[in-house]
């Protein structure tokens, strides 16, 4: 199944920081079923429409079409991924493998306390936990978002509020959080200001996004989602 993964380091390309023990596929003549069955990464395009795909194969070539020794990440034409295939910090991506294995991310961890992502209006944007620690959504500064309201729980404004969906640990279903202006705490005392809440309107506490996890953000209006640790 697809797993949403995050980059916690400023990286040049997948071959610099993303290693896996999953069995590689082969490019072959470009029509080999092994290519489609190879471990793959999908990165949402900047436009928010479509994905760029990379495959983990054992017969990649470089730009001059010389064979690349060993297994590596390659584009859909079988050429090894290069620095032009850079992945931005805090940008999430999908990973899928037909075989079990482990994945390891390595690289320079960002020393910047604040890290933002631009959110395209009215569609789901994949965002990554950019830090080597679990993330509390209410430690983030969500700017330019128009909050919704919980109201009586049936208010249309709740469903129209900016929302975050985090894939459950089982890989099945999502836990949803909403950005609203009338949250309450566990004792049902009103919370001052806007914050992220669970689906029952209670302020989210603790951590919601594990290390290495990506999540989806959707808002009716464009804005920025800024981490602040």
Task: Specify the residue positions occupied by each region the protein language model found.
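DUTPase catalytic domain/fold
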Residues: 141-212, 216-219
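A cross-kingdom feature marking solvent-exposed beta-strand/loop segments within repeated
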Residues: 50-89, 175-208
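Intrinsically disordered, low-complexity proline-rich tandem-repeat tracts
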Residues: 24, 34, 39, 44, ...
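A short, polar beta-strand/turn micro-motif
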Residues: 1-37, 45-47, 81-160, 208-229
């Amino acid at each position: 199944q697809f797993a949403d993964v995050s980059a916690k380091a400023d990286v040049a390309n997948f071959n610099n920081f993303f290693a896996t023990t999953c069995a590689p596929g082969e490019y072959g003549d470009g029509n080999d079923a092994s290519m489609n069955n190879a471990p793959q990464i999908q990165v949402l395009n900047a436009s928010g429409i479509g994905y760029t795909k990379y495959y983990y194969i054992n017969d990649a070539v470089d730009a001059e079409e010389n064979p690349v020794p060993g297994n590596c990440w390659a584009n859909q034409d079988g050429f090894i991924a290069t620095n032009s295939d850079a992945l931005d910090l805090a940008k999430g991506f999908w990973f899928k493998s037909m075989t079990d294995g482990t994945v390891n991310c390595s690289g320079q961890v960002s020393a910047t306390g604040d890290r933002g992502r631009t959110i395209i209006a009215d569609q789901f944007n994949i965002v990554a936990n950019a830090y080597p620690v679990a993330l509390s959504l209410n430690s983030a500064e969500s700017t330019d978002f128009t909050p919704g309201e919980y109201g009586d729980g049936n208010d249309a404004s709740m469903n129209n509020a900016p929302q975050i969906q985090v894939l459950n640990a089982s890989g099945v279903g999502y836990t949803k959080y909403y950005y609203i202006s009338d949250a309450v705490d566990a004792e049902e005392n009103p919370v001052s200001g806007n914050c992220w809440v669970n689906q029952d309107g209670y302020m989210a506490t603790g951590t919601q996004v594990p290390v290495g996890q990506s999540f989806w953000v959707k808002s009716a209006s464009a804005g920025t989602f800024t981490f602040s640790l």
